[in-house]
Structure formats: C-alpha cells, structure tokens
C-alpha cells in the first residue's frame, strides 16, 4: 500500500512539474512576444495587453483604455480606444468616436447585409452588377469616423508617438492597423501681447507655447503658398516637435539645407526650449555674442522670412529662432518699419550710442581717473578729486561694487512678482546709491556713471545682446584699470577682430560692413520705404528684388 501511495505521489509530482513548466514556458513566450511587439497584429487581446504593459496602466492614472464592441455586417468586433486624459477633447471622443462606433453604425449608415454596388449595366435584358466586397477597414474610416484627421498606422512606435502628443488610437479586432485620430484638446495660453518686446505702433500679438498656434500666426501674416513649414523631431525621449519655416521661392537652398542638417542631427534625450536648441546649433558657443535671433513677435519673424531667412519654432516655447543673424539685426527694433525713416534712424542712432556707453563708459571712467587725469578740465578734475577725498577704497573696488550691486538689483526685479518688480529696482537703486554716498563708500560721480550705464543698457532692443554687453563691460573695466586707454584700445581691437571672424550659418556676423557689400540695403540706418528695393545681398536669395524700382506708381500717373 505504501509503495502504491509513493508511486502515485511521484507520478502526480512529475505531472505537476511538467504542467508547471509548460505553463511557465507558455507565459514566458507570451511575455517575450508582447515585449518584442513592434507592429499591430490582428489579435485584439495581444494589442490590448501590449498597450497596457507599455503604458503601465496599473500605475498611470491618466492613461485611458476604453474597451467596447463594434457591430458591422451583423457581426460584433472587439475594439478599444487608447488616449491620455487631459490631452484630448472629451467631447470629440464621446460624440465623434464612441457614439459613431457604438450607436450610429447600427442605424444602417452602411448596408451591412449587402455588398456595395459600384456599377450597373443592362445587356440583353440581363442586369449585370459589379459589387465591391465589404471591407471593415474602409467601412470604419469612410463611414464611422467623422473627424478631419484620421491616419492608418501599423507601427506601435508611430501609434505611441501620436498618443503622447494628444491623439486617440482605435484598435479593432481582425485589423492589422490602428487609427490615429486627432482629437487634441489640452489647455493652452491664449494669444497675448509680447511681454519682452513691447512696441507702441504695430501688432500686439505674440507667440504662445502651442506650435500649431504659432504656425497659424505666421500663416495669417504670410498669405502665400510658398511658405514651407517642415516638421522635425528632436530628442529620443522627449520627441520635441520643431518646425523649420522658410519661403521656398526666396530663401537660399544651401541655408535651408544647413539648418535642416543641424537640427536633424542632434543626438540628445530631451529638448525643452528654443534656448537649448540655440546653444546646440550655434557656430561658436565659446563666445557670449548671440549668433541667432530670438523673438516672440510673429510680425518680426514674418519680416525675416520675407527677407530670405529661416525660422525655427520649438513646441512648448513662445520664442522662435531666426537665422542667420548679423550685428545690425540686434540693433533693429520691430517698431522701426512702422515709423518714418527719420524717426527710426534717430532711434537707431540713440541705440548705437547706448551700446558704446553700456560697455565702454565705466572702463573709460576708470582709465581717466587713474591714468589720464590731464584730459579733464581743471574745475572738473578738482571736483572729482574732492568727491573721492573721503573714500577709503580704490576706484576699481568702488566701480565693481556698484556695478555688481546694480546687476543684483536688476536680477531681483526680474525674479519678484511683476507688480512690485519695477518698484524694487527703482527704490533699491535710489536707496543704495544715497546710502553709499552718505557713508563715503563711493563717490557721487561714480553713482552718475553707473546710473547712465544702466539706463543705456535698457535701450538695447535685444535682451541677449544686452546681456552680452553687460558681461563685456566688466572686461573693459579691468583693462582700463590695468593699462588705461592703451588697454581699452587693445581690448577694442581684439573684440572687433572676434566680431569679424564669427559666422552665423555661413554669413559673416559683421555683414554688410565686413566684408563690405551693399550697405544701403541692410546697414545700420534705414532708407525711405520706397527705396528699399532689394533684399540683403549677403543672403544670396533666389529673388533679390523685394519691390519694383518704382513702387509708388500712383505718383507717375
């Protein structure tokens, strides 16, 4: 008896082990199949399981998998939707997808009991009908999905890319494809006035974080079919969508190809802003000089597109990039084209003066005070000496202390809430300057120099170019302290040499002055509107003329 029991126990154990091993191998094989799945298969259960595994639906609370049944030709098909809650328009999903698939198809939208008649002919009293065999794929796309954008895809990679940007996926049993339905509906900021590029006369619209809204703003200004907007994905994880915009009949082909090449050949995990892209595609990153224009104004971007340049828009960022850039671009303001050329040129002249004041005035003050006092009139020299009589610190310490303090006040004004930011800047500068003079830490003349320098820096229209000049200012302060005018002259020679050596996407940064080309078309100052006949020649555009030689034909009739 005990031997029989032992034999039975052994047999049961062997059978259990074999069954367990068979079940384990089957589950492992299924798991490997699911993990290695790359294309949509006909089995709806396999697709469903793969989707749940890839999106971790047991953990992710915003991933929605909606299973339902679709009826066609008196047959029921299992189906499911996949989308991300909060990124789709729930009304579109309910009314245009679920209702159409679950309810409308049962109201004989397509005659499911008969094939579709293509043509009918009668010969010898015999009717001959050509019919089209029922196709579930065509039936769904043509009759059941009243959505303007529906794509058929068979790759899970493409399917997941669509879901991640706000699309909805439809999987149906027996079909080796999935339907990518555009039902984006996430919240976004409305179009508002630009915050950092304010103008008095001109459009008051700015770019936003949504890339399609930004491209539509450009399309609304440029009503031309030659405006090309190409999409490129950057980032292996973020898959950030970037749009490369250019005028096909104007922009230089080599320039467009170079921009595409640089943007497309970035091997990074994530791209989050246009500022990151700017650093990745600039020619020389070691210099603080910006080589790409950044703007939040659609009218400014459109103007550069008309001139033959290329614009790159990054999804999720309200600033677009314009390339190539020259020195004259950073002195220009979007308001210049809206003003008479006399007013615009006067403003540009003030900006040129403010540029030199921003990075040269403190260094010149240090050089004159330490090395070249003989250049000052006698009365002014006595006044300077008297103001510094009770100051115990050397002039280099004074000016560095005040310049750094001014930069701290400016930075603090940017970081605090906007209603009190300007107040902190003004009050802080007044209180700090008065207290420093009263305590004999700095001289009153130095306060005037620092204040004029700070005001001049605010007159520079481009924020990044102004930042560059603010950093450059400290270098010239040190040169003026070390070697006076000679040090400043050497610094200027080196600086101009660097400017002349820089190229932005093949275009010299100092164009049209180095090398000298047609200065009248793209120099610092503007010609009258009716004389701006040509585009910048350093861009080598396909169409050089921007208007007729006689644009005001009414004057000669």
Predicted ranges, named:
Residues 181, 189, 198, 205, ...:
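Flexible, active-site-adjacent loop/turn segments at secondary-structure boundaries
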Residues 344-411:
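Core alpha-helical transmembrane segments of integral membrane proteins
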Residues 2-11, 341, 345-352, 388, ...:
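Hydrophobic, aromatic-rich alpha-helical transmembrane segments
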Residues 364, 380, 392-557:
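Generic detector of multi-pass transmembrane helix bundles and their immediately adjacent loops
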Residues 2-360, 378, 498-557:
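Membrane-embedded alpha-helical signal segments
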């Amino acid at each position: 008896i005990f031997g029989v029991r032992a034999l039975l126990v052994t047999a049961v154990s062997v059978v259990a082990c074999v069954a367990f091993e068979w079940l384990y191998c089957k589950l492992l094989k299924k798991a490997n199949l699911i993990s290695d799945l790359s294309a949509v298969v006909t089995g709806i259960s396999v697709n469903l399981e793969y989707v749940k595994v890839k999106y971790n639906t047991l953990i992710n609370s915003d991933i929605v998998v909606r299973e339902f049944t679709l009826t066609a030709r008196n047959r029921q098909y299992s189906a499911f939707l996949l989308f991300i809650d909060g990124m789709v328009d729930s009304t579109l999903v309910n009314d245009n997808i679920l209702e159409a698939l679950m309810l409308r198809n049962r109201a004989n939208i397509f005659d499911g009991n008969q094939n579709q008649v293509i043509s009918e002919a009668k010969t010898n009293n015999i009717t001959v009908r050509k019919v089209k065999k029922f196709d579930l794929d065509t039936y769904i796309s043509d009759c059941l999905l009243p959505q303007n954008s529906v794509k058929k895809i068979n790759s899970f990679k493409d399917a997941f890319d669509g879901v991640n940007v706000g699309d909805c996926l439809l999987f149906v049993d027996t079909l080796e494809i999935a339907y990518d339905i555009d039902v984006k509906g996430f919240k976004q900021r409305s179009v508002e006035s630009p915050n950092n590029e304010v103008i008095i006369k001109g459009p008051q619209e700015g770019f936003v974080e949504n890339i399609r809204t930004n491209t539509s703003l450009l399309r609304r200004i440029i009503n031309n079919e030659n405006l090309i907007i190409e999409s490129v994905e950057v980032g292996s994880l973020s898959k950030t969508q970037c749009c490369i915009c250019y005028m096909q009949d104007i922009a230089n082909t080599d320039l467009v190809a170079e921009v595409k090449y640089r943007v497309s050949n970035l091997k990074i995990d994530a791209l989050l802003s246009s500022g990151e892209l700017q650093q990745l595609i600039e020619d020389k990153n070691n210099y603080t000089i910006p080589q790409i224009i950044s703007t939040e104004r659609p009218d400014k971007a459109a103007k550069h597109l008309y001139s033959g340049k290329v614009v790159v828009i990054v999804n999720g960022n309200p600033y677009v990039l314009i390339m190539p850039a020259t020195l004259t671009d950073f002195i220009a303001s979007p308001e210049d084209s809206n003003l008479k050329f006399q007013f615009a040129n006067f403003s540009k002249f003030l900006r040129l003066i403010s540029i030199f004041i921003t990075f040269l005035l403190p260094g010149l003050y240090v050089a004159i005070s330490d090395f070249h006092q003989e250049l000052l009139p006698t009365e002014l020299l006595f006044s300077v000496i008297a103001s510094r009589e009770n100051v115990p610190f050397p002039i280099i310490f004074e000016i560095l202390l005040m310049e750094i303090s001014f930069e701290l006040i400016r930075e603090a004004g940017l970081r605090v809430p906007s209603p009190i930011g300007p107040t902190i800047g003004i009050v802080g500068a007044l209180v700090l300057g008065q207290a420093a003079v009263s305590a004999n830490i700095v001289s009153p003349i130095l306060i005037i120099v620092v204040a004029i320098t700070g005001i001049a820096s605010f007159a520079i229209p481009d924020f990044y170019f102004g930042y560059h000049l603010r950093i450059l200012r400290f270098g010239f302060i040190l040169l003026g302290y070390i070697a006076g005018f000679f040090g400043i002259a050497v610094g200027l020679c080196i600086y101009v040499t660097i400017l002349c050596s820089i190229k932005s996407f093949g275009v010299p940064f100092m164009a049209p002055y180095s090398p000298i080309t047609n200065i009248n078309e793209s120099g610092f100052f503007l010609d009258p509107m009716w004389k701006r006949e040509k585009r910048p020649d350093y861009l080598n555009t396909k169409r050089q003329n921007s208007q007729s030689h006689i644009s005001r034909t009414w004057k000669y009739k």
